[in-house]
Design a protein with these regions (language model features):
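Alpha-helical recognition/docking segments in bacterial nutrient-uptake
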Residues: 1-89, 93
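Short beta-strand elements in bilobed, periplasmic/extracellular small-molecule ligand-binding domains
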Residues: 8-24, 108-111, 133-155
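Second-shell loop/turn segments in exported
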Residues: 21, 79-85, 115-120, 145-151, ...
């Protein structure tokens, strides 16, 4: 969040961070309603499909408050801009990574998304991963399924992921998680069911828990979003709209993938930077 604060300060904007706190029962809808009631000049929202959130976005816009979604988009809402990664870009990148983890023992792949679409099979992400896997495997024998968890809250997501591992016959060989919350739930389920190393998790985002899981081999690889760009572009999108009444509808940010080796290298570099702050 430091990047967003710096970018905001450069634009003479006061940025207030509001988010889920384990010490409270507030969810994102609550924070949205608080921001609307406080008559914020603009709102930057990490959309997660929570019930009522899309209508809250529309309410904010109707009240003259511009809303910018980040990481996940509310495509049917009246939000002004989305800062993140396009489904096409994600599909291409994930397809390449998933294909690398396909081997002779791979029989089932499950893709978990939170996307505002009616048919998962029409998702660009699902389509591109499927195509990449079929090309890598050279056959149609691998079962690839997609599941949309958009309408689930945190508790429901945990239940849905846990249910996947309780059905032993249907446990996938590769589980693809397309958002932070689902990745965190999958990480915990893998530990609870003692399946580390048996199910390959392709995750999303780089929280401390997720990075630690990659280091330990619980998660095979995770998608790293350029948070510097994310912070800069989201503040830029809001301030541009406030100042000029217009902004780009989409700001694209870069991604890469971190496996165990990459995470360990990142840790070493962080320690070096702390020892030599002036270099």
């Amino acid at each position: 969040m430091t990047v967003r604060r710096k970018k905001a300060a450069q634009n003479n904007v006061l940025l207030e961070i509001m988010g889920p706190d384990r010490g409270t029962s507030y969810d994102k809808l609550d924070y949205m309603n608080m921001s609307i009631a406080a008559k914020a000049d603009g709102i930057i929202l990490q959309y997660n499909g929570e019930a009522g959130l899309e209508e809250a976005i529309n309410t904010a816009v109707r009240n003259g408050i511009p809303v910018v979604t980040v990481m996940s988009d509310a495509v049917h809402s009246r939000r002004q801009s989305f800062v993140g990664v396009s489904d096409y870009q994600l599909g291409m990148a994930y397809g390449e990574i998933v294909a690398k983890y396909v081997d002779e023992n791979t029989k089932k792949i499950l893709i978990l998304q939170k996307r505002d679409i009616d048919d998962m099979n029409e998702s660009q992400i699902y389509t591109q991963i499927s195509n990449a896997v079929k090309m890598a495997a050279g056959s149609e024998d691998i079962e690839i399924k997609g599941r949309n968890l958009l309408s689930t809250g945190t508790f429901e997501t945990e239940e849905a992921v846990t249910d996947i591992f309780q059905q032993k016959r249907n446990v996938p060989d590769i589980l693809v998680c397309m958002d932070e919350e689902t990745t965190e739930c999958a990480r915990q389920a893998i530990l609870d069911f003692n399946l580390a190393g048996k199910v390959k998790i392709i995750g999303y985002y780089t929280s401390e828990d997720i990075l630690a899981a990659v280091e330990k081999g619980v998660i095979s690889v995770t998608c790293d979003v350029d948070t510097t760009q994310l912070g800069q572009y989201s503040v830029e999108a809001v301030t541009s709209y406030i100042e000029d009444g217009r902004t780009n509808s989409f700001y694209n940010v870069d991604i890469n993938f971190l496996d165990r080796t990459a995470v360990k290298k990142m840790r070493r570099e962080a320690v070096t930077d702390e020892k030599d702050p002036l270099e």
